[in-house]
């Protein structure tokens, strides 16, 4: 009989309800939410689930005066109880609305299933889950203006560069190996991968830096689209691997077990390099903060989906990443290296995953009370 990864087998045993997503709907921009609709949705979720999600809080204000909103989900949201912290972000690049939808969809999944799904309840009770659904609101709103029905192709923020040029790529402006070469980013202000005048010159990555350095995140997903891959450091070099490359690969296998994404470094997955990226800074900067295992899920395929998947693809793509998002939250408490035949206490789920192998056979008892 086929052997199942322990976390996946345990997850199926723990899940007791299906997701009816009554708080999820489609936006007015080709099925995607506008910036204002995202703000309204965050307010609505806090109104309906005030005991589980914080009010939106700004981590920075853009050049055009828009807030970069953040919310937390936990059983005591906004309170530092020393629980493992996990971060989910989206829309570094303005033309990638599926990244935002995927994050919001997961938030709704957690809120609607808390108290009825044992896994969701355990994670919300024992994690501090933080969400930044739109990191680049100025670029996002620019696409709303030019293409109100969706399909806008603007990528960068809206920094005036002079001479009629606009925008810096937020995901080339982080401080780790910023501007290492002109292959992984560009010094040309007209380029889509323009890195800016200096590291953290842009409000969006600088706000994220300041926010992250004040917290204790263990892992992070920085959502993008597209390619159906999960990317991890290093991004800045074709041949270098992190000291934690084996662990990254193990994490990658777990995180993609349900959606079958490819996983690896930037070069291994999409065939080019990036410098000044979020993931390299999250992991590589270990002086101002502890290292964070950061990943970039690239949602959607190259053939059908690309930057603006059709409306009938929006929910399937978001749903395909629920398992990865849950697994990321599990990993904040430790890497699974063990086998377990029976779980009788939810707290033992993570404690017991510290010995043995990480497989169970179909038919073995997986009981959670």
List PLM regions with ranges.
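Extracellular/luminal regions of secreted and cell-surface proteins that mediate adhesion/ECM remodeling
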Residues: 315, 330-369
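Active-site-adjacent structural elements in enzyme catalytic domains
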Residues: 2-158
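Short acidic-aromatic active-site loops that bind/stabilize oxyanions
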Residues: 31-35, 194-201, 359
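A general secondary-structure signal for short beta-strands and their flanking turns/coil
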Residues: 83, 292, 363-367
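Metallocarboxypeptidase
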Residues: 144-145, 149-342
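Intrinsic-disorder/low-complexity accessory segments
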Residues: 1-34, 302, 314-335, 340-341
